[in-house]
Curated annotation (Swiss-Prot):
Belongs to the connexin family. Beta-type (group I) subfamily. It is a multi-pass membrane protein. This is Gap junction beta-5 protein. The chain crosses the membrane at residues 21-40, 76-98, 125-147, 184-206. Expressed in skin, much lower in testis. The gene is Gjb5. Keywords: Cell junction, Cell membrane, Gap junction, Membrane, Transmembrane, Transmembrane helix. It comes from Mus musculus. GO terms for cellular component: connexin complex. The keyword Nucleotide-binding does not apply. Residues 1-20, 99-124, 207-271 are cytoplasmic. It is found in: Cell membrane; Cell junction, Gap junction. SMART domains: CNX (SM00037), Connexin_CCC (SM01089). One gap junction consists of a cluster of closely packed pairs of transmembrane channels, the connexons, through which materials of low MW diffuse from one cell to a neighboring cell. GO terms for biological process: cell communication; labyrinthine layer morphogenesis; spongiotrophoblast differentiation; trophoblast giant cell differentiation.
Length: 271
């Protein structure tokens, strides 16, 4: 694996994320991915070999293991982490697409721009980011449900009773390292729940922020705002211009009417 490429992808994801997104990224790659790579394979490496039943009936141990472990924890976690981390790369790819499109536009036109800031979450990029948050939270919720369906209460007992064929009768089977596995399972479940909460909080934050910005754009500017020197380049001025309000430089008063023309025929102009 080329770690420089991996580091570049992570830095790109971190660059275009909010504070909540950066916390989520650190939590996933430090407490989930690294812990999984270092610990999971060692704890579950020889799980089937260490699964022991008090019978010598050929095939009984394998059948009992398959009954109590239909899907390995390690493989479920691997699939979960892959599906959870991939949507974050969609944001980086969308920003790269915007930059490439902006570059082609500059080469063709030579002036102006398509995006004032290609990395700013506006338009399609905002929807891409919201989709990635929703997808990540949904994936974690689905996998938590699957784990609970396969292993109720997420914990493993030290001994299970099996009566599946070809076992001659009910046999006792013993799981290797149950306490160590339960600690690891609880850790992975708790970190997944925290990641879900972070995704939901970030999603709510983005929606509230976007609604607030839209409300500010629709709000008419006050006289104090129009007298502000920075108001000349603000969206409020553009809105006043589009609504055909007559604004004079340094004043919000209407001009005096010409004596020989009615007020309705005065051409409204912005200076």
């Amino acid at each position: 694996m080329n770690w420089s490429v991996f580091e570049g992808l992570l830095s790109g994801v971190n660059k275009y994320s909010t504070a909540f997104g950066r916390i989520w990224l650190s939590l996933v790659f430090v407490f989930r991915v690294l812990v999984y790579l270092v610990t999971a394979e060692r704890v579950w490496g020889d799980d089937q070999k260490d699964f022991d039943c008090n019978t010598r009936q050929p095939g009984c141990t394998n059948v009992c293991y398959d009954e109590f472990f239909p899907v390995s924890h390690v493989r479920l976690w691997a699939l979960q982490l892959i599906l959870v981390t991939c949507p974050s790369l969609l944001v980086v790819m969308h920003v790269a697409y915007r930059k490439a499109r902006e570059k082609k536009y500059q080469e063709k036109i030579g002036e102006g721009y398509l995006y004032p800031n290609p990395g700013k979450k506006r338009g399609g990029l905002w929807w891409t980011y919201v989709f990635s948050l929703s997808f990540k939270a949904t994936i974690d919720i689905i996998f938590l449900y699957l784990f609970h369906a396969f292993y109720p209460r997420y914990t493993l007992p030290s001994m299970v009773k099996c009566h599946a064929e070809p076992c001659p009768n009910t046999v006792d089977c013993f799981i290797a390292k149950p306490s160590e596995k339960n600690i690891f399972i609880v850790f992975m479940v708790v970190t997944a729940v925290i990641c879900i909460l972070l995704n939901l909080v970030e999603l709510i934050y983005l929606v509230i922020k976007r609604c607030s910005e839209c409300a500010q754009l629709r709000r008419p500017p006050t006289a104090h705002a129009k007298n502000d020197p920075n108001w000349a380049n603000s969206p409020s001025k553009e809105k006043d211009f589009l609504s055909c309000d007559l604004i004079f430089l340094g004043s919000d008063a209407h001009p005096p009417l010409l004596p020989d023309r009615p007020r309705a025929h005065v051409k409204k102009t912005i200076l």
